[in-house]
Each structure stands twice: as structure tokens, then as C-alpha cells.
């Protein structure tokens, strides 16, 4: 467990890397990998079709590939990366949390949420998190390691398969939104997260064919990485986990603020919004008597007025051993009104999954 305020930007050394997987590679790299084991390059396209378009991982499902080639291709490009430990469901089965065991025994979680008009999946980019926010169960656990691009992508592939196969009530469906708001700080695992976004949005069968506009990447505010992300030219939405409008409080709630202050973080976010043409999302967990004073709402509104932003207020979700709790309804209402008075769009998030520890800030990947 990290010490209060301690930050970890780099994953521990000596951690064994996951096996290479189709989803780690570009289409050109897949052809090279297939050729390296003596197979025709077009087999790479066939494998991509099975994985990204049909969600078919088992060699016996690849009927267009000779039986004698299947096992070699599986070993080279579709090794087993992760297995399901369990699913937990709530909301009549329309919210489902999955606990995954990775190849090395590491545990991570993802959450699928089906609404009447959309299906959203919250995915993890790291096992644990090094940002050490004291109100977040993931942050309090520390960082185990980064996930590979394929380990990130496979969470979505399995979610899409589950929706197609009717495992989630409501009939067959397709994912409409992906949010990098599960375990980890996405921009601290920059290259693999960017690789995952490319796999998710590459046209089928090279990728999953999802829209960049349906993807949200959340960050506590790693300013150099935000600038770098701006240069990628993505149309994803960027969400900044702000949680306080003043440096004095944010230094405590979001320890990375000791490196990059509120105005630096917001300016980097505004730059991304201008380049991408997407509104910046401001995430703010309301904590009773800590950051929910109306004057802080007023200060936040002043910082954001006239900017292309949307404020997402999150009633604090309980975590084991936490001394904090959600705001009183009257304080929440006054906070909303203080922000809205500056013409800044603000909503309170419809929190799901709290009963199964699947809501924002609750993912701890425990086998208990």
C-alpha cells in the first residue's frame, strides 16, 4: 500500500510481460508474425476477422483455416491472456462487473452497463493505480503493472461477445460507449492505451470498428501526456478527474496536483478540446464537508465559464475503510446551482454498480 501522497508513474521493474497477441499488433505486423511461422500472410486477415468481427477465440471455430495450421496460429497470435474469475450483476442484470485473472495471476475488473438508449463499458488500463487518490479504492491499492494493449482490448471484445450472445438482458446489442475509467491512470500507460484506441477504432476486420467519438479517456491531469494525446488527432472525449477547484485541497485529494496545478491541467484540457472539437468533461466526486461547499462550486464555475466543458458530478461511492461519504442532498443542490449560475453545463451522474462495488472509485479487483 502506498504512503499518503506517494505517486508511482512507472510500473515496477522485473514484471513478466504478457505474451504477444494479435491485438498488440498493427495489420502489417500481423502479416509478418504469420509469415514468421511459415504461414501465408493472408492468414493474418482471417485471424483478425475471427477475433475482431466474430469474437471467435477457439481454433475449432476457425473453419476457413486448415486444421493443421490452427494450433500454431493460436500459439503465435491468439494465446490466452485472461480468464473470467466471476461475474457480478445488479440492476436486473443490466450492470455486470467482471473480475479477470491475467496470465500472471494479476486481477483487474471491467464493468458493462446497459441503458435503454446505449451500452457503456468501463475498462481498466492498469492493474491497480499509482495516483494514490485517498477516496478511491483502486488508488489506495497501489500499482501492480500496466496492461498490454491486447489485455485492454480483450475486455471490450468479451463485452461485445456477451452482448451479441444475449448474456446481458435486453436482447442482442452492440457497445456504443467505451470509458477508460476503470482501474488505472490511462495516460500513465500511454503507448498501450493509444494502441488500444487504434485497435478499437480501426475498421473491421483490422479492429473493432468503433467510433472514436464513443470513447472517453479519463485522467487525473498528467499535463505532458495530455499535450502528447492532443497531438494524436483523436476525436475521443477527454475527461479530467478534478475533484477540487483550488490547489490547496486538490493537493490532498489528487496528489498529482503537487506536480501540475489546477490551471495547468485545465489549460491542457482546453487545448485538447479546441484541437479535437469535443467538449471537455470535468469529473468531480462530491465528498461531504470536504469539497462540496457552494463557494467551491462558484469557484469551479468561474474557472470554466465560457469554455467548451461539461461538469459531471459524482456522488461519492463508499469504499472499505473510507472516512468519507457522499454529500447531503441540500449541499449537492447548492453546488449544482453555484456552477450553473455561470452558464456551465452540469449534471449529476447516474451512478450504477454500487451494490457490487462496480461504481466509480470502487474497483479493487478482490477475489473475496
UniProtKB/Swiss-Prot annotation:
The keyword Methyltransferase applies. It is found in: Cytoplasm. One of its GO terms (cellular component) is cytoplasm. Its main location: cytoplasm. Its EC number is 2.1.1.192. Disulfide bonds join 122-360. [4Fe-4S] cluster binds at residues 129, 133, 136. The active site is at 109 (proton acceptor), 360 (s-methylcysteine intermediate). Its cofactor is [4Fe-4S] cluster. InterPro entries: Aldolase_TIM, Methyltransferase_A, RNA_MTrfase_RlmN, rRNA_lsu_MTrfase_RlmN/Cfr, rSAM. Binds 1 [4Fe-4S] cluster. The cluster is coordinated with 3 cysteines and an exchangeable S-adenosyl-L-methionine. S-adenosyl-L-methionine binds at residues 184-185, 218, 241-243, 317. Gene3D superfamilies: 1.10.150.530, Aldolase class I (3.20.20.70). It catalyses: adenosine(2503) in 23S rRNA + 2 reduced [2Fe-2S]-[ferredoxin] + 2 S-adenosyl-L-methionine = 2-methyladenosine(2503) in 23S rRNA + 5'-deoxyadenosine + L-methionine + 2 oxidized [2Fe-2S]-[ferredoxin] + S-adenosyl-L-homocysteine; adenosine(37) in tRNA + 2 reduced [2Fe-2S]-[ferredoxin] + 2 S-adenosyl-L-methionine = 2-methyladenosine(37) in tRNA + 5'-deoxyadenosine + L-methionine + 2 oxidized [2Fe-2S]-[ferredoxin] + S-adenosyl-L-homocysteine. GO terms for molecular function: 4 iron, 4 sulfur cluster binding; metal ion binding; rRNA (adenine(2503)-C2-)-methyltransferase activity; rRNA binding; tRNA (adenine(37)-C2)-methyltransferase activity; tRNA binding. GO terms for biological process: rRNA base methylation; tRNA methylation. Residues 115-355 form the Radical SAM core domain. PROSITE patterns: RADICAL_SAM. Reaction proceeds by a ping-pong mechanism involving intermediate methylation of a conserved cysteine residue. HAMAP family: RNA_methyltr_RlmN. Specifically methylates position 2 of adenine 2503 in 23S rRNA and position 2 of adenine 37 in tRNAs. Belongs to the radical SAM superfamily. RlmN family. This is Probable dual-specificity RNA methyltransferase RlmN. The gene is rlmN.
